Amino acid sequence: MPQLNPNPWFTILIFTWAVFLTILPNKVTSHKMPNELLTKDPSNLLTEIWYWPWH
């Protein structure tokens, strides 16, 4: 049974993980958010109680 021969599949596995661990992290981390997140001052946030009209 050729499926049980680990020789070609093991090398494919090693090369695939080598690509995943060397090339892809650089491509993923090079992306930047288009909009910077703004931090709001927590003292300006006013929360009001909102009563639901249950009829």
UniProtKB/Swiss-Prot annotation:
Its main location: mitochondrion. One of its GO terms (molecular function) is proton transmembrane transporter activity. The keyword Transferase does not apply. InterPro entries: ATP8_metazoa, ATPase_protein_8. Pfam families: ATP-synt_8. Keywords: ATP synthesis, CF(0), Hydrogen ion transport, Ion transport, Membrane, Mitochondrion, Transmembrane, Transmembrane helix, Transport. One of its GO terms (cellular component) is mitochondrial membrane. It is found in: Mitochondrion membrane. The chain crosses the membrane at residues 4-24. One of its GO terms (biological process) is proton motive force-driven ATP synthesis. Mitochondrial membrane ATP synthase (F(1)F(0) ATP synthase or Complex V) produces ATP from ADP in the presence of a proton gradient across the membrane which is generated by electron transport complexes of the respiratory chain. F-type ATPases consist of two structural domains, F(1) - containing the extramembraneous catalytic core and F(0) - containing the membrane proton channel, linked together by a central stalk and a peripheral stalk. During catalysis, ATP synthesis in the catalytic domain of F(1) is coupled via a rotary mechanism of the central stalk subunits to proton translocation. Belongs to the ATPase protein 8 family. F-type ATPases have 2 components, CF(1) - the catalytic core - and CF(0) - the membrane proton channel. This is ATP synthase protein 8. It comes from Polypterus ornatipinnis. The gene is mt-atp8.
